[in-house]
Amino acid sequence: MPLPDFHVSEPFTLGIELEMQVVNPPGYDLSQDSSMLIDAVKNEITAGEVKHDITESMLELATDVCRDINQAAGQFSAMQKVVLQAAADHHLEICGGGTHPFQKWQRQEVCDNERYQRTLENFGYLIQQATVFGQHVHVGCASGDDAIYLLHGLSRFVPHFIALSAASPYMQGTDTRFASSRPNIFSAFPDNGPMPWVSNWQQFEALFRCLSYTTMIDSIKDLHWDIRPSPHFGTVEVRVMDTPLTLSHAVNMAGLIQATAHWLLTERPFKHQEKDYLLYKFNRFQACRYGLEGVITDPHTGDRRPLTEDTLRLLEKIAPSAHKMGASSAIEALHRQVVSGLNEAQLMRDFVADGGSLIGLVKKHCEIWAGD
């Protein structure tokens, strides 16, 4: 399929996607019933969309195009109410978190969807292993060249986004020792990590043509980069965050990305170059492994900075943009989180350290999501 022209969209508008876990009490393992829930709610959703993701234990909540985080929060709140009622009617529960702490990937059923079935054919068991749960945020751009500039700018802050959203310390019944283990699942994919370097939209079109020669890439949706342009929406899509445990934290993360995008495209503070990416995977690993306690390294100077310190610096820089975007409350909440030194991964570990079981942890996550 040829790459579509870049659709011009209103700059800095938002679209947010949350991949939720469908679980089956009292054992709180993943259920295989997302299709049933989608059928139950399809006539009840008035704004946004509830739809499939890769496997039948995943339920995606997606907003329409939103001006700001308050509009997005309202759409999510309405969808959440409908989905929770449908889940209760079918004796199911819903929760966030980047991974289910003890599910077995072999049990996961890939959705009966042409694209997902084709992906299963291409990638085999890797697709079942990709039963993990992330938050994706789209930001509107006025042109393809703006999208490429924004993608490179946001890529500088991938460690910050990962650390602030980290919520996947447990996988397959084991403490992984990572704050965010979810991104590791995609490490075997040939398109894992950052997008290959291009400096403008024309070069991106040439890159996509080259990738399509592999016959594994039919559309942008087949690319698993950390951040990717979405020409059919006219957006840049950030894909590195774990799904938070609460709707409020998900909205705050979207506000962070919107405000950062506004700062980047308004101030143009960086002259991007390929060397920017030399230590990308090392810095990304630090955030996944240690969360806010990680250390990032500047590929140009060799300077090493605590991620906590650098995140506070980012929040300060984007505060005026956050005010203009109506996202100041999000930046203030994230500032409090950084100062406290906590993320959701640590809260999960604290629950288990206090004697809680992994079953109890999922139950707690369902209560948190329903109560937010």
UniProtKB/Swiss-Prot annotation:
InterPro entries per UniProt: GCL_type2/YbdK_subfam (IPR050141), GCS2 (IPR006336), Gln_synth/guanido_kin_cat_dom (IPR014746), YbdK (IPR011793)
Gene Ontology molecular function terms on file: ATP binding; glutamate-cysteine ligase activity
Alphabetical list of Pfam families matching this protein: GCS2
EC number annotated for this UniProt entry: 6.3.2.2
SUPFAM superfamilies: Glutamine synthetase/guanido kinase
Gene3D superfamilies per UniProt: 3.30.590.20
Function: ATP-dependent carboxylate-amine ligase which exhibits weak glutamate--cysteine ligase activity.
Name of the protein this chain belongs to: Putative glutamate--cysteine ligase 2
Phylogenetic lineage: Bacteria, Pseudomonadati, Pseudomonadota, Gammaproteobacteria, Enterobacterales
